[in-house]
Regions:
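Accessory RNA-recognition modules of RNA-modification enzymes
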Residues: 1-333, 338-346, 352
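Conserved hydrophobic/aromatic beta-strand scaffold that supports enzyme active sites
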Residues: 18, 398-400
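Short beta-strand-to-turn element immediately C-terminal to the catalytic PLP-Schiff-base lysine
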Residues: 135, 401-402
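Short hydrophobic/aromatic beta-strand or adjacent loop that forms the aromatic wall/cage
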Residues: 128-130, 394-398
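S-adenosylmethionine
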Residues: 312-395, 402
Length: 403
């Protein structure tokens, strides 16, 4: 085990801080800017441009350092809690710095960023409504060690909502080497456990044809309560108030649009589709595009009473090439972590919408697409950032662009 004594520099995208050793960049986890630490090298090829390390002993701590509520996600442990040692307010400043730095580096924009807490957030714990676990060869539930295939058995998951904690997943033995999915939806629906995608009831799989594989999620946007049916194994915002935070931000960015045409890209099960349909009203039109067949099935059920919604199954690039809508007034998109990319941006701006509202979960991908949109006549006119993943480096943004 090679240890280096390092003086830690600024934060970097990905949950690291930057240090230097004999002129080489070292990305260090589990530390804070300004600290002096002993760091264990975890990736250190002699000819590599940079090394990776975990801070294993703090020689001079930052005033923002706190005891982690999840030691199993500390140095050498699992991923998913890499900022647990950082005070919650400082976590948000960390994320704001990363978003601003990516915009400066990739989009040549200097912009002050403030990361907002999720509604009702107090201590950064008990927010995950969905967790994914893997069992080891003895059937103990756990997670992969960071950047490893090794399963680390866990005794608790402090980020999970109480509905998941009450399932006592970590106090039981499960089949060996399986994937566990636990879902505790917001709004009163019963929690659900899947084992390798199969519903689990009591001590065994529930193989009945009508066994429950989906849940009902609820959120209030403005003064309206919305309800979505979502596959338990499908994609949904995992923070208990994430749908409210993002849905409200998107509707605020879209603005009043009675009778308008809105294009909803990467629409999933319809998180934004349903409230957008109400914004445009019965004389408007919402064209939703999603590539996952299961999500589209859920979206059809969710939007069955809104005839102004059109659903299209297929990749965004493919569907946009079919001229499903010529000139939308607004485009809303929520792409995967890799972002929309140049081709989607070019097809999007060719339709000349008045406004683009972009939901992003990766600051680097967002900044790259901010540059693409700006070069094509759509400057960034609004940006909000949300801390929907406390104790981790992840951050959600809602960006607005106007022609």
């Amino acid at each position: 085990m090679t240890l280096l004594e390092l003086t830690v520099g600024p934060v970097a995208h990905g949950g690291h801080c930057v240090a230097r050793h004999e002129g080489r960049v070292v990305f260090v986890r589990h530390t804070l800017p300004g600290e002096r630490v002993l760091a264990r090298l975890t990736e250190a090829e002699p000819d590599a441009r940079f090394w990776r390390a975990d801070a294993v002993e703090v020689l001079e701590p930052s005033p923002d350092r706190v005891p982690s509520p999840w030691p199993e996600a500390g140095p050498g442990g699992v991923g998913g809690g890499e900022l647990g040692h950082v005070a919650l307010a400082a976590q948000r400043r960390w994320k704001a710095t990363v978003v601003a730095e990516q915009l400066h580096r990739l989009a040549r924009l200097d912009r002050e960023v403030v990361v907002e807490a999720a509604p009702g957030e107090t201590d950064g714990l008990g927010w995950r409504t969905r967790i994914e676990l893997t069992t080891d060869d003895a059937g103990r539930p756990g997670m992969h060690r960071y950047r490893s295939e090794e399963v680390v058995p866990l005794s608790a998951m402090p980020l999970a909502v109480s509905g998941i904690v009450d399932l006592d997943i970590f106090g039981r033995r499960w089949p060996a080497a399986v994937r566990l999915t636990a879902v505790a939806p917001v709004g009163g629906d019963r929690p659900l456990v899947l084992v390798d995608g199969v519903p689990w009831s009591g001590d065994g799989p529930d193989r009945r044809p009508n066994a429950r594989t989906s849940v009902r999620e609820r959120a209030v946007l403005a003064t309206t309560e919305y309800s979505w049916r979502v596959a338990a194994a499908g994609f949904w915002q995992v923070h208990r108030t994430g749908p409210t935070a993002l849905g409200t931000a998107v509707l605020d960015a879209v603005g009043p649009r009675d009778g308008a045409t809105v294009l909803d890209l990467y629409a999933g099960a319809g998180l934004f589709t349903l409230p957008l349909a109400d914004v445009v009203g019965p004389s408007g039109r919402v064209v939703a595009v999603e590539g996952d067949p299961g999500a589209v099935r859920d979206a059809r059920r969710n939007a069955h009473d809104r005839p102004q919604v059109e659903l299209h199954l297929g990749g965004v690039t493919e569907v946009l090439g079919q001229d499903v809508v010529a000139h939308p007034d607004v485009v809303v998109l929520d792409p995967p972590r890799v972002g929309a990319g140049r081709e989607v941006v070019e097809r999007l701006v060719a339709m000349r919408p008045e406004r683009v509202v972009y939901v992003a979960c990766d600051p680097a991908a967002l900044a790259r697409d901010v540059a693409y949109l700006g070069q094509r006549g759509y400057p960034l006119t609004g940006l909000r950032a949300f801390d929907l993943f406390p104790m981790t480096h992840h951050v959600e943004c809602v960006a607005t662009f106007d022609r």
